[in-house]
Amino acid sequence: MNSAFVLVLTVFLVSGEPVDIAVSVHRTMQECMTAATEQKIPGNCYPVDKVIHQDNIEIPAGL
């Protein structure tokens, strides 16, 4: 099974709380890393399966 990859940016709120924001979804890790470089985002790429909360029963569109 092929996994999609999501570009995640961690933002810190004024309260100091960190929040992860999914910026974009890509077919491969290389595409994700290229997008981060092109957009100059200091984010990380993760498999979509690792980002989706396991206790959430919602299924992302297209999966």
UniProtKB/Swiss-Prot annotation:
This protein's name: Uncharacterized protein YdfD
Gene Ontology BP, a term: viral release from host cell by cytolysis
InterPro entries for this protein: DUF1482
Organism: Escherichia coli (strain K12)
